[in-house]
A protein has these predicted regions:
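Flexible, polar/acidic helix-loop-strand segments at domain edges
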Residues: 1-73
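Generic alpha-helix detector with strongest preference for long hydrophobic helices that associate
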Residues: 16, 37-41, 59, 63, ...
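C-terminal solvent-exposed extensions
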Residues: 21-22, 26-27, 81, 85-145
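Solvent-exposed, polar/charged alpha-helical surfaces in well-ordered, non-transmembrane soluble domains
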Residues: 33, 55-62, 76-80, 84, ...
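Short flexible/disordered coil segments
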Residues: 43-49, 68-77, 128-145
């Protein structure tokens, strides 16, 4: 998955050194570190990781939709690679057709509104209840005329 690296990230155990601003195709350990790593002693690192995850997912979906997934062998390979992590009653053909028709952008991604504060031991997230209710209504309800 191609991304513009958002944060300097190093994991010597995995042999990964990513530099902020670098345009990079992430595979294997680099992708793992990019979406999982956070500095627990740095306030806000969970939010930074979430931004990277959103970026990675968006790029991943875009790559799937613009790649050679139309070739059935590619779709089968992708399905087989993730099938151990899927629980679904949707058959393979329907799943592929749905994915091919899905247009995914960062505009389709929602984050619970709220505030992260430093607690006595850990970061604590407090949702904005009113804004969350508005988001739920916007996403799941349609006004009836």
């Amino acid at each position: 998955v191609r991304v513009t690296v958002m944060d300097d990230l190093t994991d010597s155990g995995r042999g990964v050194n990513l530099v902020a601003g670098e345009e990079k195709v992430l595979n294997g350990d680099e992708a793992y570190v990019y979406i999982r790593k956070r500095e627990t002693e740095t306030f806000g690192s969970a939010d930074e990781r979430l931004r990277r995850q959103e970026q990675f997912i968006t790029s991943f979906i875009t790559t799937l939709n613009t790649s050679s997934i139309e070739r059935e062998s590619q779709a089968v390979a992708i399905y087989n690679a993730v099938s151990d992590y899927l629980v679904t009653d949707v058959d393979f053909e329907t799943l592929v057709a749905t994915l091919l028709g899905y247009k995914y952008t960062e505009d389709n991604m929602y984050t619970v509104p709220g505030e992260t504060v430093q607690g006595s031991e850990f970061e604590e997230f407090y949702p904005d209840e009113d804004a969350l209710e508005d988001l739920i209504i916007q996403m799941f309800y349609k006004e009836v005329e």
